[in-house]
Structures are given as C-alpha cells and as structure tokens.
Amino acid sequence: MTDSTNVSNTENLMKYMSLDQRGSVMAEYIWIDAHGGTRSKTKTLSKAPSSVDELPEWNFDGSSTAQAPGDNSDVYLRPVAMYPDPFRRGDNILVLCETWDSDGSPNKFNYRHDCARLMETHAKEEFWFGLEQEYTLLGPDGWPYGWPKGGFPGAQGPYYCGVGTGKVYCRDIVEAHYRACLYAGVKISGINAEVMPSQWEYQVGPCHGIEMGDHLWISRFLLHRVAEEFGVKISFDPKPIKGDWNGAGLHTNVSTTSTRAEGGIKAIESYMKKLEARHVEHIAVYGEGNEERLTGRHETGNIDKFSYGVADRGGSIRIPRQVAKDGKGYFEDRRPASNADPYQITGIIAETLCGGL
C-alpha cells in the first residue's frame, strides 16, 4: 500500500514468529496516554496467567507521555483486563492497564477509575452500551488514503456501504482489524464503509458497564497496530477534511433496565430532560474539535443546542423508529466525537441519568 520501508516485512518476520518460546509468555501492557492515544510495552512472564489478578504491576516513564513530571516520572500500570494477542498468538496476551501515580492515586488521565466506580454504584440499572467508532485512513503524507494528491474525489454519495474500486479504500485493513478483534475477544459487532471516502466505521457492543470502555480501547489499539503493518495512519479527528465532507463520530447507544422494560419509552423520555439539562457538561468531555463536526449539517445536531427525535439523525439524540414502535429499547447519543474517551462518555451518561458518586 505504500513504500516498503514503512510496512512490515511479513515473510521475513514469520520465520521468527514460529520459534518456540520455551514456555515463556509475552504480555503486551497497554495504557492510554495524556493525548488520548494508546501506548504499550512488552513483559515476559514465566507462565500463562489464569486471570488478570495474577498479572504483576509494572511502570513506565510518565514524563515521556506527558503523564508525570521529570522529577517524579514513574507511573504505575495496574492490569484490569487481558485478551488473547492476535499478532503473537499462542499463549501471548494483551493486557489493558489503568495508570496510577506513586502516591497511590489514579493518574489524572486515568478516566477508567471513576467510570468503573460509577458503573458499580449504578449496577442495578444494568447499563448496556454500544459504540459506533468512525475513523479515517490516511497515507504517510497525512492525506486520506486513495484521494488524489492535493485533490479531492467525487462528491459524497456512492461511498457509504460502497462496493467496488473507486468507492472503497483499504478494505484489507478493515478486514484484518475485524479478525484481530474477534480473535482477541473484543465484542465487535459489525463494520461498514462510511459517507466520506477512506472513512470507515466499526461497532462494538452491546457491552455491560465498564466493559464498554475496555473493549473500545483495545479495539483502537488493534486498529493502530494493524494499520501500522500496512504503512497507513489512523485518524480519529472528528473533522479531518474541512468543507462538504462528513465528520467522524462515536455514536453511543444506551439502554438500562428501565428502558428495556415494557413501557420503557417513558424512561427514555425522562432521560431526555436530564440529558438536556447537562448538555454543556457532556459536550465538554465528548471530544476535542467537536465544534468542527457538530454544525447542524452532515447528519449532526448543533453543538449549542440540545434536540432529540424519532429517527432524527440531525438531532443530539436519536430514538430509533423501531424503539418508538415497540415502546421500549434504547437511544443513540450522536454528540460524541470519534476521538472521545469511552470511559468519559459512558461515565457522564451514567452520572447524568442516575446520579454521581
């Protein structure tokens, strides 16, 4: 897909990937940095752990990730979830970690900690989430992959769920990522090409409570790693190309015990009032650069105004027509940007609907 110096030499690599590890296990410790990206490093274990509780804490140089000052740079990694590693396979694992400071407090960029507490506090509500992660594929020059150099493809229209040359780009990456997620046990539920060429979407969920953020972050890590092997960049910018092009979001589907019960549409209506009252607070944690995307055009609501409706993709919240017909189900929060943190999204939704800690 690009110059060979930027991609993996798979044929050469496979000679080494098949070597016997002699009982050792490679554990890829993954964490979220200060900029909403993923970082990782590998630790050798003497045997395969049977649960995440058997994994040791580790640490990293937080001054190199903007998570700690240079004179007190150690940040600790506490494993919270583990998954089969689709790249190394065998007994090797991916380890999702929370970040903690040396004084025993969660790092200020550890949004998972408070989210997990909220989900535990409101466990009786049985929050189910489903996230729709949109992203854009970029070439090494930072321009959307497959677009004319310095130019633009034809207008939007034929690309959404498109099939065929000139309508979709980099399907190999999308398919590889799908398989990697399934192998790792990520609850990926589908994929599709999006409205803007070189933009794609995958869906994760339904997931229960804190599991939503965990699975979404691992899926992002896997996407970056897969694209790395093809020499292609992944952008979660909510408006990567200015002008008459769709932005990228992280639409968030939400249900609770109350909304799924008979007559649950009444609970959904009551939630709308609560969400409207805290619209500004939600926008504050729904991603950077979201003002470029939430303009009231290109299937978005206006960032300054809360609105909702049945089957309305131009509102802040969409209530699916089938939900309105059934009188129960879920709603879709269309405000979050593609680069938003899923822990912050799901956490503030739980807080707004059910109360804080």
UniProtKB/Swiss-Prot annotation:
Q: Where is the GS beta-grasp domain?
A: 25-104
Listed A to Z, the keywords are: ATP-binding, Cytoplasm, Ligase, Nucleotide-binding
Instruction: Give the UniProt subcellular location, in the record's own words.
Output: Cytoplasm
Record GO terms (molecular function):
ATP binding; glutamine synthetase activity
UniProt superkingdom = Eukaryota
Q: Which GO terms describe its biological process?
A: glutamine biosynthetic process
Subunit structure, per the record? Homooctamer.
What this protein is called in its record is Glutamine synthetase
Source organism of this protein record: Emericella nidulans (strain FGSC A4 / ATCC 38163 / CBS 112.46 / NRRL 194 / M139)
